[in-house]
Amino acid sequence: MKRTRGFRLGVYIFKDAEIIDYAAPYGVFSVARRLDPELDAFLVADAMKPVQTQAGLTVHPNYSFNDQPDMDAFLIPGGFGTRQETNNKRLHQFIR
């Protein structure tokens, strides 16, 4: 993918993720973007399909692992859902 100039943060969303754990950092970037419009935050999931969070909210990713979006940092939020992600080989492969 074509590289943009500003800092890009990929935020991982997965089944049973805690909303606050990915929405808060995403929100901070949206506020910071007012000062630096080149900052970018986006959601990345294992596949390009809706993801249901722990609270039942359905979230749509901007990218999938297959897209391999260009980013400077990749945030994996915490919460109960992370237990299942420790064995996600596609996630491990994506991080490398």
Spans of features found by a protein language model:
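Extended, subdomain-level signal for the structured scaffold at the beginning of enzyme domains
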Residues: 1-96
